[in-house]
Amino acid sequence: MRSGELEEKGTDIWKLFREAQQNILYLNKQRIMAKEELDRVKREKISLLDRIEQLERTKLINTRKDKFSISAELLLRIDAMVLTSLIGSKEASEFRRLIMDSNVSIADYFSEIMHKQDTELLVELRHFSGKSRKSGYHVIHVCTEMAPVVSVGSLALYVTGLSRALQRKGHLVEVILPKYASLNLNEVHGLREVDAEFHSYFNGQLHGNRIWTGVVYGIGVTFIEPLYYSSFFSRENIYGYSNDFERFSYFSRASLDYIVKAGKQPDVLHIHNWETSIVGPLFWDVFVNQGLEGTRIMLTCQSLESQCVEQPEKLALCGLDPHGLHRSDRLQDNHKSHLVNVLKAGVVYSNKVIIMSSMQTKGQIINATIHGLEPTLTIHKDKLVVAPPGFDSSAWDPSVDKFLPQNYSADNMKGKSACKVSLQQHLGLQEQASIILFVFMGSGQTPGLNTAMEYFEEELKDENTRFLNKYDEALAHLVLAGSDIMLCPSFDDTVLQVPLKAMRYGAMPILLNSTDRKSGHFVDRDLEGSKFSGYVKDNFTNIPLSQAIDELKNNPSKWDKKIVDAMTKDFSWDAECCDIHISAYAAIKNL
């Protein structure tokens, strides 16, 4: 071949090479533009849905509030009427019974006149009142957290989730909280200060408190703000101070004083963890004969590990008798006999004790040695109930989730593949719906977790691994929707609720720890666990990650059947958790 021909041939090759490069660059550019367009469409979708929600909320506020909010606000207005001496306790109780009657459309009647002054509203209440039948339980939570107003751990989600579920089933629920300086008031509607001080007992004398009321998700909330002891709740953190006993015993006593002053006569006073356990002995030793003869006490424990052990003489601060309570069958600590145990007070003095656990049975909890309460729990075992936590199925539902590029359900799973590809794009992973995607989602509050995950990513050096060390609401929804498998440190996850949400979104929850899998073989022959624990043990507990991947690859029909079945199960707050609580309320009201 001549040199000219060789030169011409080489020129053609370089020309083809440059054209190929240009084509690759063009395709990459088009890919980037397509991704940007997809991201833009998703952002517009979220923005549009947010706008629709905003318009619907505005329309709701401008026309008529929902019946729960109207009822809650009306109850708080009645409290204010009692505190300002407009009405007496007896008439207030009659009005509350009227509101509780689900057969009376009181929300429709009062929605247009809630703006009126208390004196005018009272005239309407008296005009409207008549024969009514009480159809549900009246429950007052005395607690230290409520989502989204003040959230530290699982208690906040529990109080809000359970309260909303109870109200949807026809029960009346109220919440009493300390007025912390760090409250998130964005979701508190109609926040107002009651124009009257009320006094509560502490450390030998009466002290003034300022009362605030508002409505959170249709639930009436009362905030108690100490005046003399203003430093108790004007701090940065909620817990962790040397005088936590003083802070929360003040609040517990003030809550009871407020309930009596406002003339409330609830069916159940629902107290939580050690922080409000002192309500138990206070109720039976001081308050039961002040119009609360028909009220019963329910204690819920999110955990038995935090108990608050104190000097007996401190009980006198809130009006209790240290000598009478410092006994082994009452508040005396089981191990440090010179001290009193505040959580034990709640167990001993409550009519029912609910322990929140997804997987443990009553027998396992009683026989655990780590909490030191086993003698007390054994004595009071007949009042113990175990309930699994739920989750908010209205916020975590792939069929209507506004954060997803395409919605899907157990009846139509097509959208899940689109969610997986979208997640892969977001994380810069290879985009292919058939690639198995498994995720570990944990809490940054777990000691050393971030460091361990960063080390794991560095050691693995795998282009298909991503570590994200901050929470993003939209991404959390997409991760659940785009994953095939969710690796869970535990199925007893009361904070992030990953196993519950994973099943809802069609991702298989798999335990990280083989020890936890082995514990799934333990069966309490005397006391059965929850429906949730039974379902999880039968379907997911004994499946290691390798087996799950093998099943997904080689037996997809079996995998799909299992996933779809899990998606159809209802493990929300409205289901088993709420039913267990209603049964417990019914049991103690019959005592």
Report residues per predicted region.
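Catalytic cores of nucleotide-sugar-dependent glycosyltransferases that transfer UDP/GDP/TDP-activated
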Residues: 1-591
